[in-house]
Curated annotation (Swiss-Prot):
One of its GO terms (biological process) is intracellular iron ion homeostasis. Fe cation binds at H96, D98, H159. PROSITE patterns: FE2OG_OXY. 2-oxoglutarate binds at R169. InterPro entries: Oxoglu/Fe-dep_dioxygenase_dom, PKHD_C, PKHD_hydroxylase, Pro_4_hyd_alph, Pro_4_hyd_alph_FE2OG_OXY. Its cofactor is Fe(2+); L-ascorbate. Its EC number is 1.14.11.-. It holds the Pfam family PKHD_C. This is PKHD-type hydroxylase AZC_3753. SMART domains: P4Hc (SM00702). Residues 78-178 form the Fe2OG dioxygenase domain. Keywords: Dioxygenase, Iron, Metal-binding, Oxidoreductase, Vitamin C. It comes from Azorhizobium caulinodans (strain ATCC 43989 / DSM 5975 / JCM 20966 / LMG 6465 / NBRC 14845 / NCIMB 13405 / ORS 571). Binds 1 Fe(2+) ion per subunit. The lineage of its organism: Bacteria, Pseudomonadati, Pseudomonadota, Alphaproteobacteria, Hyphomicrobiales.
């Protein structure tokens, strides 16, 4: 299940991210790649743990906590500190699957990567190429969103970034360990949550909405890992 999360960051926050990144030093993105991804990854990243990455990462995490849609789609338990990358002309990231386990930067604590997120920080007309392509049983899905918007998708997905042919593309990317390990169960809960919200809008206080909310929370209680 891929979910588009619009307007995670405001235009002012995007501008702040761009200003910080424009003044920052970048390193080879292969420094954080896994054993297979290192052979197909060609991009730049803000140094993990740098002052710039920490400032922008806190901004992103605070914005995510305010996003009801992100919470409903992902049901986050723990979010790995956001990272930031840049693709210039000729850069790309070939097909790969994200590592199942990553480690929190400061504590070294392991985190299971259930959900991947890309938060776009460049406008689509600033670059050509650079689409995120996520593959599932229904085919390949190209994603290129306005600055400040995010896409979330199961971290089990095969995906790649097409080569940049003009301009530069900057983004934040990170992983979340969900309360719900199984992507199918997350999708069912998300669909139910959306249906409950629509029912509440159309028929405020209706007993069916109350009953469905109870079913939602009982399923969450049954499936959640806390």
């Amino acid at each position: 299940m891929m979910i588009h999360i619009p307007k995670v960051l405001t235009p002012e926050q995007v501008a702040r991210c761009r200003a910080v990144m424009d003044a920052a030093g970048w390193v080879d993105g292969r420094s954080t790649a896994g054993a297979q991804a290192v052979h197909v990854k060609k991009n730049l990243q803000l140094p993990d743990g740098s002052a710039e990455a920490r400032e922008l990462g806190e901004m992103v995490r605070a914005a995510l906590q305010r996003s009801a849609l992100f919470t409903s789609a992902v049901l986050p338990r723990r979010i790995l500190p956001p990272m930031f990358n840049r693709y210039d002309a000729g850069m790309t990231f070939g097909s790969h699957v994200d590592n199942a386990i990553r480690f929190v930067r400061d504590s070294g604590e392991p985190l299971r990567t259930d959900v991947s997120t890309t938060l776009f920080l460049s406008e689509p007309d600033e670059y050509e190429g650079g689409e995120l392509v996520v593959e599932d049983t229904y085919g390949a899905h190209k994603v290129k969103l306005p600055a400040g918007d995010a896409i979330v998708y199961p971290a089990t997905s095969l995906h790649h970034v097409t080569p940049i042919t003009r301009g530069s593309r900057v983004a934040s990317f990170f992983w979340t360990q969900s309360l719900i390990r199984d992507a199918g169960q997350r999708a069912l809960l998300f669909d139910m949550d959306m249906a409950i919200m629509r029912l509440n809008q159309d028929h405020p206080g209706h007993i069916s909405a109350v009953q469905l909310t109870g079913v939602y929370h009982n399923l969450l209680r049954q499936w959640a890992e806390v």
